[in-house]
């Protein structure tokens, strides 16, 4: 996967803690999260499993989408994940 603006959701387990982020390099960012190189929420709550991501044409639209998703209630976020990844598989292998 080439560098491209992406909104992503990480979790620690099915229906667990959710983290929504945005990056221009998904591979690198998820790698950093998985190795606890990112201080803060994902390190504290062991949120390392990539369960959803969405590509965008430019960073401004990715940031807008991230903000939108962060305002959603939990049920909507769970439905978004379930729609494209009903098994809650770690999608890391898709992006490496």
Regions picked out by a protein language model, each given a short descriptive name:
Residues 67-81:
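Short arginine-rich
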Residues 1-55, 60-67, 83-96:
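GIY-YIG nuclease catalytic motif and its immediate N-terminal context
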């Amino acid at each position: 996967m080439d560098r491209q603006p992406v909104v992503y959701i990480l979790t620690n387990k099915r229906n667990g803690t959710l983290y929504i982020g945005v990056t221009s390099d998904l591979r690198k960012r998820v790698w950093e999260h998985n190795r606890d190189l990112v201080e803060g929420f994902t390190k504290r709550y062991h949120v390392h499993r990539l369960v959803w991501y969405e590509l965008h044409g430019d960073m401004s639209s990715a940031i807008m989408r991230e903000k939108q998703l962060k305002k959603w209630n939990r049920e909507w976020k769970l439905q978004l994940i379930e729609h494209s990844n009903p098994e809650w598989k770690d999608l890391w292998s898709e992006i490496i």
